[in-house]
Design a protein with these regions (language model features):
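Glycine-rich phosphate-binding loops of nucleotide-dependent enzymes
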Residues: 2-244
Length: 244
């Protein structure tokens, strides 16, 4: 049974189809990639999974339990966390405070006995931001801001982690660090779903990849299978390689 199971999800805005019978599954202990051209529906799918957008049809389940009708905070209690394509940090707070807010909220609604301050400190070390822990996030470069947002998601101890273009703005060193962290999270049993335009990162870190085009899943397979799929080459990878 997949940790996350999205089945036949469609989203329509009037006559516009954002998702068309899209399905996606993510297993515990795996990094699942979700790629496709701009406007393919990747963020829309994340919004459906997290409860920010109701589907026109279809269903979402975690560990076999249907969560389609649950609001976002109840989905979070089921172990779901995400980052956003645009940074959504508390701009008046420091790195430490941003993560501590999430850790404290998690303890309150989960009855977790771990001290939020201790968890926050451990996460700061894990994402490599000890030197800037007490700096306001507005002073950080974008790549480090992405790490703060990841740290805030980790404060909620997710079993399903959705990452929307988390490597955007990162330099090569930060991307390498990020890739190692994703693999560590998978090895700890987290189901990671990665939306990312950095094709090299996706191919290096993902166990399986799904490809969206015009709201439909056109391919699913291992990185090697995706790289040789004619439909994917036509719709996405060929264009991506040509733009590098």
């Amino acid at each position: 049974m997949p940790r996350l199971d999205v089945r036949g999800v469609s989203v329509r805005f009037g006559g516009n189809v954002a998702l068309d019978d899209a399905s996606l599954s993510a297993d515990a202990g795996c990094v699942t990639g979700l790629i496709g051209p701009n406007g393919a529906g990747k963020t829309t799918l994340f919004n459906v999974v997290t409860g920010l957008l109701p589907p026109t049809s279809g269903a979402v389940a975690i560990d076999g339990s249907d969560i389609t009708g649950l609001n976002p905070h109840k989905r979070a209690r089921r172990g779901l966390a995400r980052t956003f394509q645009r940074l959504e940090l508390f701009t008046m707070l420091t790195v430490r405070e941003n993560i501590l807010v999430a850790a404290d909220i998690h303890r309150k609604w989960s009855r977790d006995k771990e001290d939020p301050a201790e968890r926050t400190d451990a996460i700061i070390g894990r994402i490599g931001l000890r030197a800037t822990a007490d700096v306001r996030v507005t002073a950080l470069p974008t790549g480090q801001g992405r790490l703060v947002e990841l740290g805030r998601a980790l404060a909620c101890k997710p079993t399903v982690l959705l990452l929307d273009e988390p490597a955007s703005g990162q330099d090569d060193g930060e991307t390498e660090q990020f890739a190692r962290l994703l693999r560590e999270l998978a090895e700890e049993g987290v189901a990671v779903v990665l939306v990312e335009h950095d094709v090299r990162l996706v191919m290096a870190v993902c166990d399986v990849i799904s490809v969206l085009d015009f709201g439909r899943v056109i391919a699913m397979g291992t990185p090697a299978e995706i790289q040789s799929d004619e439909a994917v080459l036509t719709a996405y990878l060929g264009a991506s390689k040509g733009s590098e």
